[in-house]
Amino acid sequence: MKFIFYLFSIFCCLCSCAQSQNISGRPDAVRIGAQFARNSTIGRVAAVAVLAAVNDINNDSNILPGTKLDLHMHDSSCNRFLGIVQALQFMEKDTVAIIGPLSSTTAHVLSHLANELHVPLMSFSATDPTLSSLEYPFFVRTTVSDQFQMTAVADLVEYYGWKQVTTIFVDNDYGRNAISSLGDELSKRRSKILYKAPFRPGASNNEIADVLIKVAMMESRVIILHANPDSGLVVFQQALKLGMVSNGYAWIATDWLTSYLDPSVHLDIGLLSTMQGVLTLRHHTENTRRKSMLSSKWSELLKEDSGHSRFLLSTYGLYAYDTVWMLAHALDAFFNSGGNISFSPDPKLNEISGRGLNLEALSVFDGGQLLLEKIHQVDFLGATGPVKFDSGGNLIQPAYDIVSIIGSGLRTVGYWSNYSGLSVISPETLYKKPANRTRETQKLHDVIWPGETINKPRGWVFPNNGNEIKIGVPDRVSYRQFVSVDSETGMVRGLCIDVFVAAINLLAYPVPYRFVPFGNNRENPSYSELINKIITDDFDAVVGDVTIITNRTKVVDFTQPYVSSGLVVLTSVKRQNSGGWAFLQPFTIKMWTVTGLFFLIIGTVVWMLEHRINDEFRGPPAKQLITVFWFSFSTLFFAHREDTRSTLGRFVIIIWLFVVLIIQSSYTASLTSILTVQQLTSPITGIDSLITSDVPIGFQVGSFAENYLAQELGVAHSRLKALGSPEEYKKALDLGPSKGGVAAIVDERPYIELFLYQNPKFAVVGSEFTKSGWGFAFPRDSPLSVDLSTAILELSENGDLQRIHDKWLASDMSSMSQASELDQDPDRLDVYSFSALFLICGLACIFALAIHACNLFYQYSRHAAEEDPAALQPSASDGSRSLSRRSKLQSFLSFADRREADIRRAAKEKASGLGGSGGSMSGVSFTSSGSGSTTASC
């Protein structure tokens, strides 16, 4: 036992010595640099927070034992050149890491120096998304990248249903790169930046006003403002003067606004009045213990600050505080891994010679790569929440508060997180649940928008540039009821035009427009070329009989269809005379066969049920066969003479007569239709038979039917013939394929209906083989298409759409076209139509026969017992057993064929004969039971 104690003591001594050696190997102080701009709001807060963090770390024995952080701070005063010089000064004095800079633009330059000298550059405010760890490995962003902020803004735009936005931003790396990221995120959501309005850093009030005037002339009323606080506040002041912070506008400012407002002890009411209804974002931080401790002693920290100004703690101050702790944890791990603070000359700098340049003072941090690795491996709970990096070098769990500026303060209306999107529940609560970013879960509280309204801004208006939107209309030469252009006056009219004008008049805002004809006035134009004019910006919209098809929806947006359409087959037809065998046409062959079989089945079933009790169903076999046929078919006319006496027989007859009544009524109605309505026939039965044949097919010039037949259905181009007018339709069909015409025409239903109204001798065969409609075409993501769709639905609901239809097309045109549609199997009834009736009747027959058979077997068993009791005993041999079965079958069939009354009479006679001879049988007497069986008594 003492030996074990000695070993344990030796082990503890060795560990203590090793630890002492490890600690003693650490330097007494580690030099770190920090760069701020005290003339900025973020810089003032961050400077105090960094000093507080250094003091807390140096007074904490659990972190960096035996080593103190030696902080050296420089004030760049937002001067980029000065910031670069100060960074060089840090690197001349063996600095292991630099906290800062504030500016993304400065960070781009300093990151190159950090990469060369292996000094980690840890910035808590450089949010430019292009400052990636791939290009700048020694740049460490200790705040949330603008990549996530722009994702949050894009989610806001999608949540409110806006498709176009205008961006105003400062024209530097910070502004340009963030807006570029926003554009990428919006495109993923089928939205876009309509207009980008940059302004130079330090722009004057007049310059910003000029930018805003251009923005006001754009159609988008959703404005994203990404700027520095100084210039951003000027934007709001000038926008208020121009009336741009009013009803109809929606403003979203990035987190620069909250970074300016949050530190303010007293919010300036005059300043807030310039941004009423603005939405902005704020970095979301959890309520951690370290955050509470820092907030509670903030006022004391301000007294120690040399600035003597009062301001509150902001989220950037929390990130600055966590940055120092992040570096401390990394240095602790660095020393624990055996790292040493040492520097060596950069051989590349030795090759550069220059008077007055002290380049040899710049040295490479030998342990920089190891320290960088330890920084990326930190994992602790800081003032902002969990501090940890993902594989891309970004802090985990990026989140923002969505803040609304209203009245004299700020109101949080929701949250955004990369985990669950928009929500009214805090992100740290949602982290405990499975991720869910469905549309139903994306929620925010109500927002009061500019103009003090709770109604969400529409987000766009027509641009205030005095220009009208150009609307292309097809200059048709046929079917001009739908759309036509007067060659003399240039007036555009037709059903499509009236629908468009009626829909435009329902909009809540004016739409300046003018119609521009498209075509050569000799033949119908190509509608595909007309749609392409929208893509090339020759037209702002297309109005006409434009079919909504898949290929077109990929390049333009369509409104709600205002006319239903679809491709049909039109062909010549011949009259079909009724003929002498017309009475057979109401039923199909299968229906005739099944009906005839059921007549025979019913006759047979009734004969089986009535044969033993009804003399009308007895007699010689020939007579019985005739009776079965006569009885079954006479039920067709309800003229059967034979009386049914059994209950089961009557049950079957009742059901069968009901079936006969239905069949007879249907037959009469169908035959009447066949004999009184003109029947038409055609060798073409629909699109399938048309494709498989080799006959030529006509189509309308300019229609999509040509491409559909050739590309989708595989019809050879040599079979397709272009036709330009109803007259050409009629002529081609009259000639037929043998004389240079066509066998059929494939076109859209509205045109065919109009053609059939004037030419009733033709007909549509088969059914529509495509389903589509006509709509108005607009550029992709055009908000006008959405509003017009709503207006078209309103026209349909209030009946105006039908009234416009009746104005241009005859009211009875539809009924005429429907009457001209050809059914290749008119009014013929199939078995399927009566399957339920036949099934019920069949089940009734089976049920009746089952009961009848059970009753018959029961009667036979009693009869056999009376006739020969020994026959019921089992036979001894196989031969006798076979004879017994044959005799039993013959006996049963004989019994089933006999009249039931005869069997009862014979049983009674036998019973009375046995009773009369009772005196000579040794006192044995027999009595007859009520059921015809006999019992013996001694």
Swiss-Prot record:
It is a multi-pass membrane protein. It comes from Oryza sativa subsp. japonica (Rice). It holds the Pfam family Lig_chan. Disruption phenotype: Plants are defective in root elongation and show reduced mitotic activity and increased cell death in the root apical meristem (RAM). Residues 906-938 are annotated as: Disordered. The gene is GLR3.1. One of its GO terms (molecular function) is signaling receptor activity. This is Glutamate receptor 3.1. Glutamate-gated receptor that probably acts as a non-selective cation channel. Involved in root development. May regulate cell proliferation and cell death in the root apex. Residues 610-618, 640-650, 852-938 are cytoplasmic. The keyword Coiled coil does not apply. One of its GO terms (cellular component) is plasma membrane. The keyword Flavoprotein does not apply. May form homomultimers. Keywords: Glycoprotein, Ion channel, Ion transport, Ligand-gated ion channel, Membrane, Receptor, Signal, Stress response, Transmembrane, Transmembrane helix, Transport. Residues 922-938 have a biased composition (Low complexity). The chain crosses the membrane at residues 589-609, 619-639, 651-671, 831-851. It is found in: Membrane. Residues 1-20 form the signal peptide. Expressed at low levels in roots and leaves. Its main location: membrane. Induction: By abiotic stresses. InterPro entries: ANF_lig-bd_rcpt, GABAb_receptor_plant_PBP1, Ionotropic_Glu_rcpt, Iontro_rcpt_C, Iontropic_Glu_rcpt_pln, Peripla_BP_I, Solute-binding_3/MltF_N. SMART domains: PBPe. Belongs to the glutamate-gated ion channel (TC 1.A.10.1) family.
